[in-house]
Amino acid sequence: MFRDLKPAYLFCCSVLYAFSVLRPSQGISVSTHHNLHKTVGSDVTLYCGFWSNEYVSDLTTLSWRFRPDNSRDIISIFHYGNGVPYIEKWGQFRGRVEWVGDISKHDGSIVIRNLDYIDNGTFTCDVKNPPDVVGTSSDVHLTVYDKIPPVGAGVVSGAIIGTFLGIILLIVGGLYLFRYIVRRRARSETSFLQRRRSAAERGKVSGKAGTVSKGPVLYATLDQSKSGKGASEKKSKLSESKRDKK
C-alpha cells in the first residue's frame, strides 16, 4: 500500500519545490492616453508608461505601431531593444519621429512632428520586460484637425443645461432668502407691538389702582378736619360759660 503512494508523494514534493524555487512570470501593465486632438503642422507627444515587477535591463523591448483610420494595415514606426532606440527610416513617418522616453524611468514616449491628415489613426505601445512578457498593449487614438478642434455637441448641451440649472438654483435661493427676511421683519414688528401693548396695559392698571387708593385717605382727612372743628367749638362754648358764671 505504501509503495503505491510513493510515486504520488514524490510528485507532490516536486511540484511544491518547483513553486517555491521557480518564480513565475508576472504581468506587465502598459498605459497611454486614450484620445488626442491636434492641428495640422503641430507636434504631438505619444506617452507610454509601463509598470513591471522586474528591473529594467537590456532585455526590455518597446515598440510603437500605427493603424490608420478605415484601414487594417499596421505600420511599425519605432522600436527599442538592447538599450538602443530604432526609428524607422521609411514610410509616412520618416524623419518625423523622435525618442523622448527613458526606459529606466518606465517611460517609452515618442514625439511625432509636423502632423498631417494621414496621421489620423490608432497608435499602439507594447512593452516586454522579461520575465514579464505577459500583458496587454495600450492604444491611443489621434485626430488631426485643420483648425482648433470644435467643441462637441455633448459639451455644449452640458454647458447649457448646467448654466440653466445654476440660474434656477440662484432664483430659488433668492426667493427663500427674501421670504426669510420678510418673515423675520414681520416677527420683529409683531413682537414690538406686543411689547408696546403690554406696557400700555400695565400703565392703565397702575393708574386705576392709584385712584382707588386715594379714596380712604381723602375720607380720613375729612374726618380729621370735622373732629378738629368740633373740638374747637366745644372749647369756645366752655370758655363762654365760664365767663357768664363769673
UniProtKB/Swiss-Prot annotation:
Positions of disulphide bridges: C48-C125
Glycosylation sites: N120
Residue span(s) of domain Ig-like V-type: 28-143
InterPro entries: Ig-like_dom, Ig-like_dom_sf, Ig-like_fold, Ig_sub, Ig_V-set, Myelin_P0-rel, Myelin_P0_CS, MYP0_C
Extracellular side: 28-150
Biased composition (Basic and acidic residues): 231-246
Residue ranges of the region described as Disordered: 200-246
Annotated tissue distribution: Found only in peripheral nervous system Schwann cells.
Residues annotated as transmembrane: 151-178
Gene Ontology, cellular component aspect: plasma membrane
Localization, UniProt: Cell membrane
Superkingdom in the source lineage: Eukaryota
SMART domains reported for this sequence: IG, IGv
Gene Ontology biological process terms from the UniProt entry: myelination
Modification after translation: N-glycan is sulfated.
Membrane-related topology note: Single-pass type I membrane protein
Signal peptide extent: 1-27
Cytoplasmic compartment segments: 179-246
Keywords tagged on the record: Cell membrane, Disulfide bond, Glycoprotein, Immunoglobulin domain, Membrane, Phosphoprotein, Signal, Transmembrane, Transmembrane helix
Family under the similarity heading: Belongs to the myelin P0 protein family.
Biological role stated in the UniProt entry: Creation of an extracellular membrane face which guides the wrapping process and ultimately compacts adjacent lamellae.
UniProt name for this protein: Myelin protein P0
The encoding gene: mpz
